Design a protein with these regions (language model features):
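A structured phosphate/pyrophosphate-recognition subdomain
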Residues: 1-11, 88-167
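Anionic-ligand anchoring segments at beta-strand to alpha-helix junctions in alpha/beta enzyme folds, i.e.
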Residues: 1-54
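Short amphipathic alpha-helical segments and helix-helix/interface helices
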Residues: 3, 28, 71-75, 157-158
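Glycine-/small-residue-rich active-site loops that bind phosphorylated ligands and cofactors
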Residues: 20, 66, 145
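Charged/polar interaction segments and conserved charged motifs
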Residues: 25-28, 64, 131-133
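Short, well-ordered secondary-structure micro-motifs
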Residues: 26-27, 71, 94, 148
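Active-site cofactor/cluster-binding pocket
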Residues: 37-99
Length: 167
């Protein structure tokens, strides 16, 4: 989400990943090997802590519990926090969020983000790699479109395919 929006707004963006693990490594490698993206696109929590400034906006995706974010300290340091998630909220929530969009009926956070991108406007351009990542996120969370799917899921997938997803 933040990559294509930030690019349109000419803002610097970083993805904070403390440990990419084996499931995310192919995507991390795709971004690292793509000249369209800065070398410091994907950073760890400590690097993010060192970079945080007064105007930083922290976008937390696919989680709404502070204790399971990749870097809980960022939640204390950032004044502007946006949360996008499809998991039901429990008693532990990110309380200081400027905006919290939690939709438990969505199949995935990638579905929610895809829906939002459709309504932002024509000037937002999603790169193929970003569409691939979001499409893959939908596939993973729906077990290849077998569970938790609905019309919105397939509309989001179709939007991503129209915008370059080729998974």
């Amino acid at each position: 989400l933040p990559i294509c929006i930030a690019a349109t707004l000419e803002k610097k963006v970083h993805i904070v990943l403390s440990d990419s693990g084996t499931s995310l490594q192919p995507f991390v490698d795709m971004f690292h090997n793509n000249p369209d993206y800065d070398d410091d696109l994907i950073i760890n929590g400590q690097q993010a802590i060192e970079m945080v400034g007064n105007n930083a906006v922290l976008v937390v995706v696919d989680v709404n519990k502070p204790s399971i974010t990749d870097c809980p300290e960022l939640l204390r340091l950032c004044k502007s926090i946006v949360v996008f998630d499809h998991h039901r909220q429990g008693t532990e929530v990110i309380e200081n969020a400027t905006l919290s969009y939690v939709e438990a009926y969505a199949s995935s956070t990638c579905e929610m983000v895809s829906e939002m991108l459709q309504y932002i406007g024509e000037n937002i351009k999603i790169k193929n790699i970003e569409a691939d990542c979001m499409y893959s996120g939908i596939m993973i969370d729906t077990n290849n479109f077998m569970t938790k799917t609905g019309v919105r899921t397939f509309e989001a997938a179709a939007f991503l395919r129209r915008n370059g997803a080729d998974v």
